Amino acid sequence: MSKISQLLSNKIQVKIFNRGRQTAVSWVLLVSLGIILALVLPTHAEDTPSPVKLNQQGRNYYSAGKLDQAIETWQQAAAAYTAAGNDRGSRDSYLNTATAQQALGLYDRSCDSLLSAFKITDNSCNQIIEDVQIIEPQLDGIKTLNQKAKSKLLPAIAAINQQPEEQDKVQGLLRFGDYLRASGYPRVANQALELALASSQKLADPQSKTATLLSLGNAQRAIALQKQNQFSTQTIVLDVVANNSGSVTSALESYQPALDYYQQASEVTPRQPDSLKAELNRLSLLLDIQEFWQGAITDFDRHLDSLEINDPEFLQEITTGSKTLKQDLEQRLESEIGNAIAQVEPKVTQLTATRGGIYSRINLAQSLMRRGASDSQTAQILATAVKQARSIKNVTAEAEAMGYLGSLYEQQGQYKSARRLTEGALQLAPTAEYPDIAYRWNAQLGRILAAQGQRVPALFAYETSFNTIRTLRSDLATTPVEPIFREYISLLLQAEPSTSQLAQARDVLESLQVATLDNFFRDPCSEIAEKPVVIDDVDSKAAVIYPILLQDRLEVILTLPGKPLRRYTIPNLTPEKVDNTIRQLRRNALTNPGFAEQIRGARGNPQSATEIAQLKTSQEKSLQQDILPLASEIYSWLIEPAEAELKASEVQTLVFVLDGSLRNIPMALLYDQKEQKYLIQKDYDVALSSGLQLTAPQPLTKHKQPIRVLAAGVTSEFPAYRFPPIPKVEDELNTIKQIFDKSEILLNQEFTKARLEQKLENSDFPVVHLATHGQFGSTADQTFILSGTNQGDPLINVNQFDNLLRAGNLKRSQPIELLVLSACNTAEGDSQAILGLAGVAVRAGARSTLATLWSADDEATANLMGKFYTNLSQNTQVSKARALRKAQLELLMESDSQYRHP
């Protein structure tokens, strides 16, 4: 018997308690309730006994982990205090309610409680989020609450900050900061928390100060993660190695504020629960940093050749710098992590059987599991947590501890014990009563059963987890669920899946697209079609291709008109191989983005014929050597296995629901080496979809009225954003007006957010065409377009843009059928950015989007758009995909064409 097994058999037995309904508790409770309770218990003489008793009951429920009952009781106490005219008691009860709601992850509801606590009636939580979406990007780079930051203070924060210097004010700001951070706005959260810290210092209250420093650490941690996600790992490593001499200090710079706040929190009141939480959070952050940099440097070294550095001296410099950085970081982080464990572990193991102590044990055990520490040591910590939770009858804590103990066994390959513990956790916290716990343990059970070769029960466990996640969509908008979805798809597509399993795999993939959009926008507002769209109902000549990147292979599900689903597999094709191929193709396709300008410039020279010939020879060589082989390889993955069936079904339109890095290149670029044709030259119209759960496409020409376009654009440069002028935009908009004379134009200074909103609200434009600078990044904060205003900030961030389009839709009789973004860039190699681009249209109700995947020549864009709209105007039955394909082919096939590929 292993050491873990001996320990487990000695420490615990899996047994199930009969109990009343309780609501699940997240193991990460960042701020203790004791601060508020200390205020609530000493009541005023004029209070009636009823609210006092209710407050005590709420406290008892909270300590026992019965948070839903605590919330209900404190809400009753607040109502009783209000009826008695006791504002202070009512406020304390609402603050306690908000604390318990946040402990359950119900941050949206905690906002309502906070507004009630401070009687803020002129701001709803929805309005607060709309304001935050504007303020958050403006605070990027502002490290302290200086005068500029204070001028952008959220009205609700300002209202709380105007309260007298009392504990209630500190707690209100603290809870509001935690709410904003959890909602995805850590910079605005930081404002509230800095004000809370200042108040706690004025009150000389060490407990409040500790809690606030802890929350500031959490906010700064979220900011550091956002910064980390802004750039590729290669860019981050290269910046540190090339520009900062491989400095460890530089590598840790974005994380240092969070580490410092955690350290300060642990020192103010060393024996308090929040101090211990700060130490545990600091340890987990150090592990996050270590894992990120290990992966980043490994990825950088692996792809160093793809950077195409021609200077041998510089190449040697960064190669050496990368190696040195890796060694120095490893030494520094190993030392800090070791010291952190040595300091916190003795404190945790001495904790008594309280709710906070149990979750501290679970927190430490998770870090030790990531660290690869002694299995018996970690098992002992978790076994004690199970025993303590049982002793105080805290079922949720017991289920959490037991589930993580099962995870430890799973890591060690002891699947029999892992299964027993995981099933025990699910019996304690069944799906119907504890969905936000159970979805994780059901997925874990699915993995364990699959490892034991029990595919059918494993599929059932995964299906339960998947269905639970869908019901929890509103609560999991910022929670990554991708690993669970991909594990489930992989299992569904093993061996010879049935038609129903193929359909389920397709549905799971589409749900993953929805979840990714929810995570991108930080809320679950991507509208799902009430009824899944059957492609035959939309286009009887269309096929849908679903490539799915799995750990060890590429799977493709094919939907053909009127036929059962089929699937084909490309074995041993890993996501890394796909990523490398896509990255190289994209880079090669953009090696000389100025080629068109060079051709045009050469036409005016005396030796133009010779120069043009040389340019074309060079570019043709690059095309044959660097682009077509890679485009052909991807074609062989996605199209070649289905060619015969596509022809037999007389398919005319290929709709791609792309996965991962496959979103980073246009499918029109795929190349059939046998026929020596691009995909769009093979009589296929090409369209992309973010998933038919999300869209119900309709022909643009369904409208009987003449097509009207709202066309807005900017020609000027924006030095602050490093965007050059795009002079051909004016020609582009004028061409649209010539083709569709009922269209309206907003150019340069006429193109403001207010004018755009007015036009969208007052007129039904089936097409909205925006020819302006913009960027789509991996998060909503990095995604924006620029208006032409010369007063104030020209930036329209993605949430403002989303609100503009949605507000217009509320007053429109018809939705926007086509949204065109003809000059925007997507972040290089960022597949989520492309999905986010499509998501803007999906959420706003626009049925189709046409946009550039990378920086395009403005004259080429103007020409393409002119041909595209001409095609739409000449044939009222033509689809948008057909009109675009025809325009692309016209540019490619022109004599003396300056364009090499789609």
Spans of features found by a protein language model:
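Short, charge-rich amphipathic alpha-helical segments embedded
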Residues: 77-94, 103, 513-522
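Non-membrane alpha-helical segments in proteins
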Residues: 52-63, 88-103, 130, 137, ...
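Alpha-helical segment of the N-proximal tetratricopeptide repeat
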Residues: 52-69, 80, 179, 244-247, ...
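Catalytic cores of enzymes
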Residues: 537-572, 606-623, 627-902
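N-terminal secretory signal peptides that target proteins for export/translocation
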Residues: 1-20
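N-terminal leader/linker segments that initiate helical-solenoid repeat arrays
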Residues: 34-76, 83-84, 88-92
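Alpha-helical solenoid repeat scaffolds used for protein-protein interaction
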Residues: 115-118, 122-139, 146, 154-158, ...
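Classical Sec-dependent N-terminal signal peptides that target proteins to the secretory pathway
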Residues: 19-41
